[in-house]
Swiss-Prot record:
It comes from the Bacteria. This is Methionyl-tRNA formyltransferase. InterPro entries: Fmt (IPR005794), Formyl_trans_C (IPR005793), Formyl_transf_N (IPR002376), Formyl_transf_N_sf (IPR036477), Formyl_transferase-like_C_sf (IPR011034), GART_AS (IPR001555), Met-tRNA-FMT_C (IPR044135), Met-tRNA-FMT_N (IPR041711). Attaches a formyl group to the free amino group of methionyl-tRNA(fMet). The formyl group appears to play a dual role in the initiator identity of N-formylmethionyl-tRNA by promoting its recognition by IF2 and preventing the misappropriation of this tRNA by the elongation apparatus. It comes from Aquifex aeolicus (strain VF5). SUPFAM superfamilies: FMT C-terminal domain-like, Formyltransferase. GO terms for molecular function: methionyl-tRNA formyltransferase activity.
């Protein structure tokens, strides 16, 4: 049985680790160090570490990338599998295993290379995305492709639901591809670099909704940045969780109804269906209207 060194950190990598633990000999899990989380800033282990400990798999959390080289030399894996590890690997590590270093990327490469392919695909209004299994090289997400699988982006999908779908389907694709790779039945296909697009990390300022954009664009931003896209109302921050486009025109950012929470955009309007109130309570738009009683045409982006 082939010896796999698994490298992954967040929840997205958990289904892949589960599948590999069932189908191969996972000799170790490499994850990012524990980080402070929550209001108490308690040191919290990454999800892959929690699963590895449960499965009795050795866990490694190097602080620096250069620590990976002696680790891989010592463990001697047949293949390194990378799923959202969180750092670019040193060149010296990539070719150490006889079956190279393989990565699962949540887009149909060469589209959406980079750290935020799921968010960016939804924010761009894409109707389809998928997973790519590829060889890792020195450039970001530019290695030869071993397998791809398409997945539709449903209208109801947001970052959370689409991430779960891609993580589960990607885990199976990765395991099946690795089996064929070990048997010599997969031929790497170079990417068309001229068609490459990029998915840079989401910046802090992008979470704030700009009502001057079209309603479709704002809705897709809310879906892609779920659950953290926000606006302000009477000086308080409100997170918008779910919205639908309404064929109604008005001044961008102003409330257009007294019973339903409808906000005008640069083109058409959005009905806010679910939100998190300033008090941190998840609620429907209609309940917000009853509780906060906003005035007709009151700005929904006021400081």
């Amino acid at each position: 049985m082939k010896r796999i060194l698994f490298m992954g950190t967040p929840q997205f990598a958990v289904p892949s680790l589960e599948e590999f633990a069932k189908n191969f000999k996972v000799i170790g899990v490499v994850a990012q160090p524990d980080k402070p989380a929550g209001r108490g800033k308690k040191l919290t282990p990454p999800p892959t570490k929690v699963l590895a400990q449960k499965l009795g798999i050795p866990i490694y959390q190097p602080e620096k990338k250069k620590e990976l080289i002696p680790l891989v030399e010592e463990l001697k894996p047949d293949c390194i599998v990378v799923v959202a590890y969180g750092k670019i690997l040193p060149k010296e590590v990539l070719d150490l295993p006889p079956y190279k270093t393989i990565n699962l990327h949540a887009s149909l490469l060469p589209k959406y290379r980079g750290a935020a392919p799921i968010q960016r695909a939804i924010m761009a209004g894409e109707k389809e995305t998928g997973n790519t299994v590829m060889l890792v090289n020195e450039e970001m997400d530019a290695g030869d492709i071993l397998a791809q699988e398409k997945i539709p982006i449903e209208e109801e999908d947001n970052f959370l639901t689409l991430s779960e779908k891609l993580a589960k389907s990607g885990a199976k694709l990765l395991v099946n591809t690795l089996r064929l790779w070990f048997e010599g039945k997969v031929k790497p296909v170079p990417q068309n670099h001229e068609e490459a697009t990029y998915a840079p990390p989401v910046q802090k300022e992008e979470y704030r909704i700009c009502w001057k954009a079209s309603a479709e664009s704002v809705r897709d931003r809310i879906r892609g940045l779920y659950p953290n896209a926000y606006t302000t109302f009477r000086g308080n921050r409100i997170k918008i969780l779910k919205a639908r486009v309404v064929d109604l025109e008005g001044y961008p950012g102003e409330i257009q109804d007294t019973k339903r929470l409808i906000v005008a955009c640069g083109e058409k309007s959005l009905e806010i269906l679910e939100l998190i109130s300033p008090k941190g309570k998840k609620m429907r738009g209609e309940d917000f209207m009853r509780g906060y009683r906003p005035q007709l045409y009151e700005p929904f982006n006021s400081e």
